[in-house]
Amino acid sequence: MKVFQYVNIVTCDQDFHVYLDGILAVKESQIVYVGQENQEILKQADQIIDCQGAWIMPGLVNCHTHSAMTGLRGIRDDSNLHEWLEGYIWPAEAEFTPEMTTKAVKEALTEMLQSGTTTFNDMYNPNGVDIAEIYEAVKASKMRCYFSPTLFSSDVETTAETIARTRSVIETIKGYQDPNFKVMVAPHSPYSCSRDLLEASLDLAKEENIPLHIHVAETQEESGIILKRYGKRPLDFLDELGYLDHKAVFAHGVELNEAELARLADSQVAIAHNPISNLKLASGIAPVVQLQKAGVAVGIATDSVASNNNLDMFEEGRTAALLQKMKSGDASQFPIETALKALTIEGAKVLGMANEIGSLEVGKQADFLVIQPQGKIHLQPQENMLSHLVYAVKSSDVDDVYIGGEQVVKDGQVLTVNL
């Protein structure tokens, strides 16, 4: 058993327990004790690590990203979503090769780990992606993920062909039998997929008994496209198809009205909130406070580096908090506790993984990050730790990261990704 001593622990559990000068005990991959110092636990330890007053919190959960796009960082700034996609992103992705995408994913894994992210939910354009190579890279990194091929409607492939190709990838991923590398059915969006493909995607998700992952209600332009095409707004259209009755992660959820918020509250949908990407593409500000009050699970996400332009979840959480205060006109909204939970346990709920990760509790996987505040002026005074973790911390402040009790980042250097 390994014990981390002299640590200040932010558990992000249901009651948001915080233990100052506490200990965290890990046996194999699981947490076996978290709390104030316990002499019996210390006596049983095979190894005691003196953390010298460091801060420990759960590994961060990135609920929506596109790691294969890491090579497109900075490809196009100052464009709205649809111009950005059609004029720059999709043409660039058409030129992807396995060498390019594997390199991009490894770079994303490195960036995520260095900034404290331990779990991510990925949607990737299948063009130029070798799933076997990606699996080996993610497996070596020790990160946990959903890695899902995106479905699009096109002139070069029928719906049946797209579904068959996607099913093949799903079966390949399932064949790995790796609980840390899973898959969802990921139709890109209501505007880039035909009705037939959206229906077939839902059928495939039911058949494979896996969740859906889709961009929904991201922009006013999307709402206009779907209203013109089907006579309904995006959420109503997907509800008609049955999407709200299947476990799903909806990325964005910016353009939602009161009736749609109420419908989401009675659905199996969770929201991946991408505040910085939504700002950069001028998409809008998601009604996160209203979603949370309605009981909808909302996690934080970075989207891709092509629209962000980094994978810094701490920056994302800070931006989310500031935006919700501004949007509501009430500075008490989205407080520190809510922000830290959104980065961790709420993200785990979005991905259906809250029984395994997202908080530091006995029986859960030992996924956590360590920040040593000593010598970092912007993290002083140290007694205001919780405030600093939302409003002052930088991704570069992360010193160490553990996944399943195994160290994957040491002194800011990633140990498990070979670039």
Q: Residue ranges of each PLM-predicted region?
A:
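Alpha-helical scaffold segments that flank or form the walls of functional sites
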Residues: 73-143, 164-176
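Glycine-enriched alpha-helix->loop->beta-strand junction motifs that scaffold or abut catalytic
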Residues: 142-144, 202-210, 243-246, 263-272, ...
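N-terminal metal-binding scaffold of metallo-dependent hydrolase/deaminase domains
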Residues: 1-42
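His/Asp/Glu-enriched, well-ordered alpha-helical/loop segment
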Residues: 240-247, 289-375, 392-393
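Active-site gating loops and adjacent loop-to-helix segments of metal-dependent hydrolytic enzymes
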Residues: 71-103, 141-142, 146-149, 155-156, ...
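Metal-coordinating catalytic core of metallo-dependent amide/deamination hydrolases
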Residues: 129-254
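C-terminal cap of metal-dependent C-N hydrolases
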Residues: 12, 365-416
